[in-house]
């Protein structure tokens, strides 16, 4: 493919509005362009990478018997009313009307559509299991699109749905998908973890997320590639090395999710779902009587603890939420933070929002900073973190502005439902008892759910079982964020390329080091001087030879300065660069391996053989 015939609008500078390196490089290297807020055009390079990823998916899904189809993106609202999600999905749902004033949506996901198709066609357990998937654009009206392809209003997704006559059959397919996802992300060159995830708006029960890890850019050996002009990091002057470190640190870590994982076991979970080892304690201290104390100007836990000279772990944090229009009091040990996902899941609520101060005052009779669980109205629902039940003689708000109560004892002074609703902390014991929890940032690239009968129940999707009884179809759901794969790969494979000029100056610039499986082309074939007939002839021969051996070749035939060509090559990030330069008449070319910066000169006759050796090594 001739580079002069492709739309690859590279930029000389990083885009000023980019906050993460993947967004900056996709724009600068000419992979994507923003059409409007949260909506992107995938230019030829990005489209080729996405198509290669689709090929990987199709190959792995064929192995597990998944069949591809295509459903419409424009959906009637009636389907979503059947499932109940039209009212509960929230403001992210694109809603529109046609000329007949009928309600439609742009699909963010397709559970309802696939359920309807199977409901209308499948009547017996003998027709199951079915394993269907599609790859298409989805739509979500993000309030604040950001970080390039990571948070957009239109995005490409693979969504699959499986249909079963029992849960045992679902378990088999779920495990097939888990293994297929691991194979897909491994082939894509991603560093990832499969973690315990939240079903969220999908309504899933068991679920697993696949997170591409986005580590801090502190390891120079990983993030910096030295040109052959620099022997090692030790040769770089200290002041230049500090500049390089600052440049690496300047780009924020893009992972939108925090992962908690064990240092010594396979346990890993999204922070929203992570838990820790919990051991109830036996109360040995005598219970004090309740005492009301004045705490003027104390609005926060740390202010109250300091004023009363107690540790924050001896205080009770009282929060008020509105869950599906009903008030719920949530209690935590004072130095803990609420995990609203855990609370929402426990309550099985569609909506969960923090109460306003006006709502809190109406419920407790006091404002924020003085709320507590003692002497609440009969029938008040109190959900307390399990650690709260270990407290003895704690401090809590008195439900009276400027006052708190000491000597508060769970069980005696209030009744509650005890469940894990806190956010775990680094260094706590893993829930399996092996190792401690550490945190990492990650980008969600895949998610699998056991939906069960959530949609078949609400939409009447039933089959006749072995005994002739009508039973709901059991479902699974399996998603991959196809377009955000591009961002995840670049986040992990961006590199800072450093070289030394003949004058002794050090220069560095960001570029991409694409893994072979996803690179838009395998080889970047560069002609230094397109006016040199010997170079042109050799380039044409090499291009034909490489393509005959199955290499995808991008040939830079542009009449540009060699410096611009090399800069664009570093930006675009193909695994191999072959340069036809001054020694073209002698049949000598240069091979450069992008991942390491290593380069060698070889006879053009030996190019294919040499590449086969080098690609095996790297």
Swiss-Prot record:
It catalyses: tRNA(Pro) + L-proline + ATP = L-prolyl-tRNA(Pro) + AMP + diphosphate. The keyword Protein biosynthesis applies. It is found in: Cytoplasm. GO terms for biological process: prolyl-tRNA aminoacylation. Its EC number is 6.1.1.15. SUPFAM superfamilies: Class II aaRS ABD-related, Class II aaRS and biotin synthetases, YbaK/ProRS associated domain. Keywords: Aminoacyl-tRNA synthetase, ATP-binding, Cytoplasm, Ligase, Nucleotide-binding, Protein biosynthesis. Catalyzes the attachment of proline to tRNA(Pro) in a two-step reaction: proline is first activated by ATP to form Pro-AMP and then transferred to the acceptor end of tRNA(Pro). As ProRS can inadvertently accommodate and process non-cognate amino acids such as alanine and cysteine, to avoid such errors it has two additional distinct editing activities against alanine. One activity is designated as 'pretransfer' editing and involves the tRNA(Pro)-independent hydrolysis of activated Ala-AMP. HAMAP family: Pro_tRNA_synth_type1. Homodimer. This is Proline--tRNA ligase.
